[in-house]
Amino acid sequence: MTPATRQEVLGLYRKVFRIAKNWQSASGQIEETMREKEYIRNEARTLFRKNKNVTDPNLIKQCIEECEARIEIGLHYNIPYPRPIHLPPMGLAHKQGRTLRHQERLRKISKPIYLKSHDEVS
């Protein structure tokens, strides 16, 4: 990782924690605000630690873009949680042969950039 990239990543990490510090939930309730602040901090720690050993410059760039997208979406919609994705038609076809490969390809294509680090939950 180049020093400039390292500085950019650390800047994003600090930015996420500053956002969490000043976060207000949409409902304005103190309990919900505290839960959302904790979620933001835990999510940042988890994803940054998960990707800390990434050395491929293209993959690092994708992770940076994902982080920036999550920040912008969270601030715009005032929700700290990732927005749900909707599978395309035939995204849940029977798991056999070519149909399975086609289903996996559809799921990969439909996954937005802000969810690339998240594992799929079945």
UniProtKB/Swiss-Prot annotation:
One of its GO terms (cellular component) is mitochondrion. Belongs to the complex I LYR family. PANTHER family: LYR MOTIF-CONTAINING PROTEIN 1. Coiled coil: none annotated. InterPro entries: Complex1_LYR_dom, Complex1_LYR_LYRM1, LYRM1. It comes from the Eukaryota. Pfam families: Complex1_LYR. This is LYR motif-containing protein 1.
